[in-house]
A protein has these predicted regions:
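ATP-dependent NMP and nucleoside kinases share a basic, alpha-helical "lid"
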Residues: 111-129
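Acceptor-substrate binding/catalytic loop of class I
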Residues: 75-76, 170-177
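Short beta-strand/turn micro-motifs composed of small residues
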Residues: 132
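Short, well-ordered alpha-helical scaffold segments within catalytic/effector domains
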Residues: 82, 86, 113-116, 177
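Generic, ordered loop/turn and secondary-structure boundary motif
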Residues: 41-42, 110-111, 172
Length: 177
C-alpha cells in the first residue's frame, strides 16, 4: 500500500503557514513534502489560467522539476500529475522514515472550490489544520508582499478597492486581498 499525505496545513495567504510548516517539519513524527505548497488538490487553480505576472513569479515547470531526484526543496508548485504528487510523498517517506504524518501545507486549498472534495477522496481520515489571521492585518501583509515582488503598483487603499470590486477574485490572477 502506498503512503499518502495525512496532515494538511491549510491557511490564508500571509497567515503564518510557512512558519508553522517549518516548525512542524522539525518534529520527528512529521515529514514535510519537498514542496511546501504542492497545490495538487486545488484542481481548479492551475498555471494555464494564472496571470503572466504570477507565472513569472512562480517560475514553475512541473516536467523539469521531476526530471532529477532527489527533488529540491521548493516553496510552491502546482502539481497536476498524481504520479508526481506520489513522488513527493515517496521522497518524504524515504527522507523521514520514522514519520507518523506526511505534511502538505498548501494555502491554495483554502481558495479552491475543488480542494475539500479532492482531499476527502484522497485521505478521508487526514488531519487538517486551518490557519487564519485578522483579515485587515492579513490583507496589508499580503499587499506589502505584492509590492515587494512588483505585483502591485498602487497604494493600499486603491489596491484594496480594486480587488473588492472583483467578484470573485481569482487565485493566480488577482491578489485576493
Amino acid at each position: 500500500m502506498k503512503s499518502k499525505a495525512n496532515l494538511f496545513l491549510i491557511g490564508a495567504a500571509k497567515s503564518g503557514t510557512t512558519a508553522l510548516a517549518a516548525t512542524l517539519g522539525q518534529h520527528p513524527a512529521i515529514a514535510p513534502l519537498p514542496i511546501k505548497e504542492p497545490g495538487h488538490f486545488s484542481t481548479d487553480l492551475r498555471t494555464p489560467v494564472f496571470s503572466s505576472r504570477y507565472n513569472r513569479l512562480l517560475q514553475w515547470d512541473e516536467a523539469a522539476y521531476f526530471k532529477k531526484a532527489p527533488f529540491e526543496e521548493r516553496h510552491i508548485g502546482f502539481i497536476e500529475s498524481e504520479l508526481n504528487y506520489q513522488k513527493l510523498v515517496d521522497q518524504a517517506v524515504a527522507t523521514y522514515p520514522e514519520h507518523t504524518y506526511l505534511l502538505d501545507a498548501s494555502t491554495a486549498y483554502l481558495y479552491s472550490a475543488n480542494a475539500p472534495a479532492q482531499l476527502r477522496h484522497y485521505a478521508a481520515d487526514a488531519k487538517i489544520v486551518l490557519l487564519l489571521r485578522n483579515p485587515i492585518d492579513r490583507a496589508y501583509s499580503h499587499y506589502t508582499m505584492a509590492l515587494k515582488y512588483g505585483m502591485e503598483q498602487e497604494g493600499p487603499l486603491q489596491a484594496f478597492k480594486r480587488e473588492a470590486a472583483l467578484h470573485p477574485a481569482h487565485w493566480g490572477q488577482d491578489e485576493c486581498y
